[in-house]
From Swiss-Prot:
Gene: recF
DNA-binding recorded as keyword: yes
Role played: The RecF protein is involved in DNA metabolism; it is required for DNA replication and normal SOS inducibility. RecF binds preferentially to single-stranded, linear DNA. It also seems to bind ATP.
UniProt superkingdom: Bacteria
Cellular localization per UniProt: Cytoplasm
UniProt keyword annotation of RNA-binding present: no
Residue numbers binding ATP: 30-37
Entry-linked InterPro entries: DNA-binding_RecF, DNA-binding_RecF_CS, P-loop_NTPase, RecF/RecN/SMC_N, RecF_2
Protein name: DNA replication and repair protein RecF
Length: 397
């Protein structure tokens, strides 16, 4: 799969831009702040409906404009598909596929698949769990677009339930011995949260199982080290179980977590047991919003133990594993390879990792590279070149 045409209207710094692309390698070269990353960010947004740089959509709309539009022609197995996404800050996005509106935006997800490598990826290893949860969810949306709706529903219910918990404490104190209406309503929201949360947890755990062998293999490719990189899923619903619950082997617990019905029952049980603490603190203490992707290196936590170089190798392995999974899924389903985006990542790597990464990705169907100077693009990735300056994109090779 590759993107043959990209058009941006009021997206970031671009008021109106149309560029043609081709299979193979294309480097966007120019000083920082000139709009290189904005180009590849738009391609990434079409795949996941989220930016790898910011958590909200408001920053994507050019200053002074009401909305931004991203259009891309995607070629899969020689068949072009036009995808268009309209971004309006504070409102639901709207999408078109081949110029026809779709009833749900998520129907356009997964058409323009991509994997973005960026300097921010180091936070996948060294940062908070939120970034690792987002890594899993963004990949899930590309593999199974309907899960975008599940994630949105879970986030909506979580906000409602958390607001209810915050109000339940004062309501309980005012009511004395009586049960406030807020607590009776809480049972309903518990059910909604458990149902959506269980589906999300089960999907994440299956994804981790599929990613695991790819992460181990790609870490070895990038680092040439003997230390084994292994990922696993830490579920808050398991940690919330009573202390006297039987201890089970990891594989057994993981298998159970792939069954949404079992996860739903455990979430309901945990919420009932933790209700008093949740009301006191005004937060939801269990659910996929409190889970984590655990990264280990030679059986030690990568966060805190891995060196800077090892952390970079791990971050690259996670992205390369994502690419391998999307590629295999695309080949089976007729979608082809995802677009590979390397956003200013080579400037962050030592010479050995630069060479290894470049040699691994060079054969991909389409590779888009951004760099501040041409010297940052490895020789293995020689191809088309576009200079980016002041919001203008000029092809020079």
């Amino acid at each position: 799969m590759y993107v043959s045409d990209l058009a941006l209207t009021d997206f970031r710094s671009y008021a109106d831009l149309v560029i043609g692309l081709e299979p193979g390698i294309t480097a966007f070269v120019g000083p920082n702040g000139q709009g290189k990353t904005n180009l590849v960010e738009a391609i990434g947004y079409l795949g996941t409906f989220s930016s790898h740089r910011v958590s909200g959509d408001a920053a994507l709309v050019r200053w002074g404009a009401e909305r931004a539009v991203v259009r891309a022609k995607v070629v899969r197995r020689a068949r072009p598909t036009l995808v268009e996404l309209e971004i309006v800050a504070g409102r639901a996005n709207r999408a078109r596929v081949d110029r026809s509106p779709v009833s749900r935006v998520r129907e356009a997800a997964g058409i323009a698949r991509s994997v973005i490598f960026a300097p921010e990826d180091l936070a996948l290893v060294k940062g908070d769990p939120d970034g690792r949860r987002r890594f899993l969810d963004d990949l899930l949306v590309q593999l199974s677009p309907r899960l975008a709706g599940v994630r949105s529903e879970y986030e909506r219910v979580l906000r409602q339930r958390t607001a209810l918990l915050k109000s339940a404490g004062p309501a309980r104190r005012r009511s004395g011995d009586g049960e406030p209406a807020a607590l009776r309503t809480l049972d309903v929201w518990d059910g909604h949260l458990a149902r959506a949360g269980a589906e999300l947890v089960a999907a994440r755990v299956r994804l981790v199982q599929d990613l695991r062998p790819h992460v181990g293999a790609t870490y070895e490719q990038v680092s040439a080290a003997q230390s084994e990189a292994r990922i696993s899923y830490r579920a808050s619903v398991e940690e919330a179980r009573p202390d006297d619950a039987p201890t089970e082997v990891v594989e057994s617990v993981e298998t159970e977590l792939t069954r949404a019905d079992l996860v739903e029952a455990r979430l309901l049980e945990a919420m009932a047991r933790l209700r008093t603490r949740e009301i006191e603190r005004g937060v939801s203490l269990v659910g996929p919003h409190r889970d984590d992707l655990v990264l280990t290196l030679a059986d030690m936590p990568a966060k805190g133990y891995a060196s800077h170089g090892e952390s970079w190798s791990y971050a690259l392995a996670l992205r390369l594993a994502s690419y391998a999974l999307l590629r295999d899924d695309g080949e089976a389903g007729g979608g082809g390879e995802p677009v590979l985006v390397l956003d200013d990542v080579f400037a962050e790597l030592d010479a050995r990792r630069r060479t290894r990464l470049a040699s691994i990705v060079a054969s991909a169907e389409q590779v888009l590279v951004t760099a501040a100077v041409a010297e940052d693009v490895p020789e293995e990735l020689e191809g088309a070149r576009m200079d980016v300056m002041g919001g203008e994109v000029l092809r020079v090779r």
